[in-house]
Amino acid sequence: MEEEPWSRATLRVWAGEMTVAQIGAALKIGAERSDRLWCVDAGGGDLHLDDLLKRVEALLTEHREALVQVAARCDVDLFVSWSPKPGQDSVCLGPGLIELLGELGAHVVMDTLTD
């Protein structure tokens, strides 16, 4: 039985000069937390990865000012994970998303799962 494709896009902020609680208070976005990591998931399930990345771009745009301030004190990355289609698959990072991530000094971490 073939598994359904899945995807996930998560904006992550690593506690550095700020605690995870301080990061959450500064960003005012409901998110998952651990001792060293604050993260917000753009969704998943049946959404296509391109749609998830558009959600991330909208989130970055909406909270840009606060994210820039936090990114000056903490490492930020975008964790992108998906099961690619058999053969060949692609991911599109649009210019707006790239510009916003660049402004934060954020890395993009790509994680794929294949059989």
PLM region spans:
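Acidic (Asp/Glu-rich) sequence patches and key acidic residues
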Residues: 1-115
